[in-house]
Amino acid sequence: VCSSDLCVDPDWEPFEILDKNGKHVGIAADIIRLISSKLEIEIKIIPTKTWEESIEFSKEERCDLMSFLNETPQRKEWLTFTEPIFKDPNVIIGRLDSPIIKDLSKIKASIAIPKGTAMYERFQKDFPKLIIIPVNSEDEAFKLVEEKKADLTVRSMIISAFNIKEKGFFNLKILNQPENYENHLRIGVIKDEPVLKDILNKAIVTLTKEEIQNIINRWVAIKYEKVEDY
């Protein structure tokens, strides 16, 4: 059995967190366990305090793998990516009294986005009129909108549904689902391990819609779309 070191997002509930005992739990954790059981690869978690620290560890090759992330031009500088495991739309979140947003490029507003995320990278480039407020966690992004310190946040549908329901952000709502901003979540593999990427892909293409939906259902009630572009 070969083993690989994995860096994760320690604060991305319900996708993944490191719990108080340092255990990797959540949707991504369960899917990665399923992949590792299909391949007989032992995956060891390298603990970090933040997603940004995980990115630094990955760049320093202190971990071979990065859990559940979008492929972006910046990340491709040091990572190669598996096939997408699943896609999850991003949604714009505002307060109950916020107007529906038809076109993000036409508005001036402040938007809270966690640092080091794909949306942080893309929104800076795509929407120069938006004032981006960098935050350290999902929770902080939702709180800033709730406390009127930011007008909006953009987060994954699964994250948003979970936070609004489970964490009681009941004065927040989904305002829009911007086109072409889905999360195509993959595993990132450091560039000098191309064989490892090929091995992971062998298991990823065998994952069924039912297997993934069953895992998602353990954490949140939401319908999942499988990416059919392998």
Language-model features, listed with the residues they occupy:
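Conserved functional loop/turn residues at catalytic and ligand-binding sites
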Residues: 62, 149, 211
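Extracytoplasmic small-molecule ligand-binding "clamshell" domains
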Residues: 4-77, 113, 131-138, 143, ...
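Hydrophobic/proline-rich hinge and linker segments of small-molecule sensing/allosteric domains
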Residues: 5-10, 80-102, 115, 187-191
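Short beta-strand->loop
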Residues: 79-87, 91, 131-133, 169-181, ...
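Alpha-helical transmembrane signal-anchor helices
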Residues: 228-230
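Extended ligand-binding regions for polar small-molecule ligands
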Residues: 26-38, 96-120, 124, 158-161, ...
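A ligand-binding cleft/hinge motif common to bilobed small-molecule-binding domains
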Residues: 52, 56-59, 68-78, 125, ...
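Short acidic, glycine/proline-rich loop/turn micro-motifs
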Residues: 16-21, 104-105, 125
